């Protein structure tokens, strides 16, 4: 049966760089690897073809020979101008995958036949807590509850009943994995007898069935530090999933989510708010009373002639800087409110005010219309 073109197998052009070939193989190998397709013979054959293609195209000498002679370069026919590479693919899957994936497949993260596999470490866990802005300002202790694997109290995580000892697995001889030869290729898989442990417990703990861990509810009191922001995480070492047979436990990551505040918005340690003021206060100036996140009230001066969009700054009236004694600032943005539903007398007074000749009274609008007049004058002159 004729072989598929190596370039077509990997989905790359004949001018592909080594990086492009490596990237293409990585993508295809993840899809067809036997560990991700258990019992799928078609996927296994596809994976063999991909690995053979990669082994040839990633090597400059082999690739040059393949480009010149095609598959004949590897049939041992050197006398006919071929190129003998000991049947083409001479490598080991684990060599390729260690190079590409750092031992993620086959070798079980580097725990191959050189030594017995250790117990699998517990997974890290995530827990989200929702707090108020005031909680972030003051700091808080938050009770949390979650269900996960915890160390078995009966066997203290060993998986053995009483003083029972473990014996070496006769299938993998303590390696934790077994290798099978299929044609040119060597495939390494986790030992199905000992599940990669390399040893078998003679008398398993009845409570945990030899795993050294059981599912249970965990209750903790988490300290939320002052100044924490949404998306910040708190790491609790060893509070994640318990490891298999006494292996290292995972960590717990508590993520904070701060509720939307009815008055303040936040950017880092600084707080922002928008305050509407009367037109007369903006024009004449004065003072307003402003609440702070710490529960106090502050008298704030509004300068004469304030405009919408002007900002007033209150130093160190913002949020605490996390793990520091400093605080951010509070910014008050002014919005000048236009009066509505005026009485007849109020309208007359406003009209009288507007009729008073004072070019400096409304500098923005006066300056704007002067620019408009100048604009039209320039157009007409052209």
Curated annotation (Swiss-Prot):
Zn(2+) 2 binds at residues 169, 172, 191, 194. One of its GO terms (cellular component) is cytoplasm. A zinc finger (CR-type) spans 139-217. InterPro entries: DnaJ (IPR012724), DnaJ_C (IPR002939), DnaJ_domain (IPR001623), DnaJ_domain_CS (IPR018253), HSP40/DnaJ_pept-bd (IPR008971), HSP_DnaJ_Cys-rich_dom (IPR001305), HSP_DnaJ_Cys-rich_dom_sf (IPR036410), J_dom_sf (IPR036869). CXXCXGXG motif repeats lie at residues 152-159, 169-176, 191-198, 205-212. Its cofactor is Zn(2+). GO terms for biological process: chaperone cofactor-dependent protein refolding; DNA replication; protein refolding; response to heat. The keyword Repeat applies. It comes from the Bacteria. Signal peptide: none annotated. Belongs to the DnaJ family. Homodimer. This is Chaperone protein DnaJ. It comes from Ehrlichia canis (strain Jake). The gene is dnaJ.
């Amino acid at each position: 049966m004729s072989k598929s073109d190596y370039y077509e197998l990997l989905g790359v052009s004949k001018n592909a760089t080594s990086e492009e070939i490596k990237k293409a193989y990585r993508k295809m190998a993840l899809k067809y690897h036997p560990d991700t397709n258990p019992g799928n013979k078609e996927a296994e054959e596809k994976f063999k073809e991909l690995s053979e293609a990669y082994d040839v195209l990633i090597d400059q000498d082999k690739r040059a020979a393949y480009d010149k002679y095609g598959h004949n370069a590897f049939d041992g026919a050197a006398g006919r101008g071929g190129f003998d590479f000991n049947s083409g693919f001479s490598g080991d899957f684990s060599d390729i995958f260690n190079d590409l994936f750092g031992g993620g497949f086959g070798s079980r993260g580097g725990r191959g036949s050189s030594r017995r596999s250790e117990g699998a470490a517990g997974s890290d866990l995530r827990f989200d807590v929702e707090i108020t802005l005031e909680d972030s300002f003051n700091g808080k202790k938050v009770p949390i509850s979650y269900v996960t694997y915890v160390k078995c109290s009966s066997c203290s995580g060993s998986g053995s009943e009483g003083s029972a000892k473990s014996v070496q697995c006769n299938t993998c001889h303590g390696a934790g994995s077994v290798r099978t030869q299929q044609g040119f290729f060597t495939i390494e898989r986790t030992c199905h007898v000992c599940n990669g442990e390399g040893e078998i417990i003679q008398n398993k703990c009845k409570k945990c069935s030899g795993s050294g861990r059981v599912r249970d509810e965990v209750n903790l009191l988490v300290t939320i530090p002052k100044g924490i922001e949404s998306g910040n995480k708190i790491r609790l070492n060893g509070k994640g999933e318990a490891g298999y047979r006494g292996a290292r436990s995972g960590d717990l990551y508590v993520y904070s989510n701060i509720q939307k505040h009815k008055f303040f918005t936040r950017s880092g340690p600084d707080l922002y708010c928008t305050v509407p003021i009367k037109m007369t206060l903006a024009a004449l100036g004065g003072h307003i009373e402003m609440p702070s996140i710490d529960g106090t009230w502050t008298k704030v001066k509004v300068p004469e002639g304030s405009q919408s969009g002007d900002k007033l700054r209150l130093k160190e009236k913002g949020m605490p800087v996390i793990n520091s004694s400093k605080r951010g600032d509070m910014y008050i943005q002014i919005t000048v409110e236009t009066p509505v539903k005026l009485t007849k007398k109020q309208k007359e007074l406003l009209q009288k005010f507007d009729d008073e000749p004072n070019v400096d009274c409304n500098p923005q609008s006066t300056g704007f219309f002067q620019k408009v007049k100048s604009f039209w004058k320039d157009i007409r002159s052209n």
